[in-house]
Amino acid sequence: MNATAGLPVVGVDLAKSVFQLAVADGAWRIVEQHRLTRTQLERWFANRAVGLVVMEACGSAHHWARWLNGLGIEVRLLPAAYVRVYVKRNKTDAADAGALLEAARLALTSRQCG
């Protein structure tokens, strides 16, 4: 399954006021990282073509998933326990966003996700 169709995949670490994004290319290499406020996040997604967004399932994840679906972006929510094992460094927002991409890559290639 090619969920990205040549478009970037974005891992989003959700937080109360600042969000960390890791953007991967079609080969799942992280090519960009961003730290955005809520307003900046909304503007960023509204102005970008994105193939897939992966987020850790949490309280606000469903709100953001619905909003992103409204923009025509496919969203996958991953259980926190599944993502946690892919954090390779100290736990930071940037590491979490990268771990989301790694977890999604492995889940999509083994068909465990969605």
Report each predicted region and the residues it spans.
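Phosphate- and other anionic-substrate recognition elements at nucleic-acid/protein interfaces
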Residues: 1-114
